[in-house]
């Protein structure tokens, strides 16, 4: 497990929403895990899930008492990015503002490098 300063940010809006969701689940040991999988219309897609486990090699990023966890394979595609949260006419969602993405699909759920 790594707790070094990494070039990946966890926005205040995302941390606030994660904190609210954790309170709803009544499980303070939950962390938000962001990961990359193959798929989507652009080759890779982002995934978000709650996790209670920090695996060997994972990187932890903290904001306002909330922890974001990223596995080493996913982190290489997220360097310089920002994990954020938005609410709007299209609904609410977590997303990644990723400077490494050379193309993204229209909804922003998948990307290529």
Swiss-Prot record:
Q: Which UniProt keywords apply?
A: Iron, Iron-sulfur, Metal-binding
| Comment on bound cofactor | Binds 1 iron-sulfur cluster per subunit.
Return one GO MF term. Answer: iron ion binding
Q: Known PROSITE patterns for this protein?
A: HESB (PS01152)
GO CC, one annotated term: cytosol
Offer one Pfam family short name for this entry. Answer: Fe-S_biosyn
Instruction: Give me the residues that bind iron-sulfur cluster, please.
Output: 41, 105, 107
Return one Gene Ontology term, BP aspect: iron-sulfur cluster assembly
Tree of life domain: Bacteria
Q: Which cofactor does it need?
A: iron-sulfur cluster
Question: Record keywords: Iron included?
Answer: yes
What this chain does, per the entry, is described as: Required for insertion of 4Fe-4S clusters for at least IspG.
Subunit architecture:
Homodimer.
Entry similarity comment: Belongs to the HesB/IscA family.
Full protein name: Iron-sulfur cluster insertion protein ErpA
Which species is listed as the source? Vibrio cholerae serotype O1 (strain ATCC 39315 / El Tor Inaba N16961)
Q: Which gene encodes it?
A: erpA
């Amino acid at each position: 497990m790594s707790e070094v300063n990494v070039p990946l940010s966890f926005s205040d809006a995302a941390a606030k929403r994660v904190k609210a969701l954790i309170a709803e689940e009544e499980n303070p040991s939950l962390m938000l895990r962001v990961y990359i999988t193959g798929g989507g219309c652009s080759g890779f897609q982002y995934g978000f899930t709650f996790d209670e486990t920090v695996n060997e090699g994972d990187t932890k990023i903290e904001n306002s008492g909330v922890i974001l966890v990223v596995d080493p394979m996913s982190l290489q595609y997220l360097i310089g990015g920002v994990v954020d949260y938005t609410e709007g006419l299209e609904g609410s969602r977590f997303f990644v503002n990723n400077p490494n993405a050379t193309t993204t699909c229209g909804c922003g759920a998948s990307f290529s490098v």
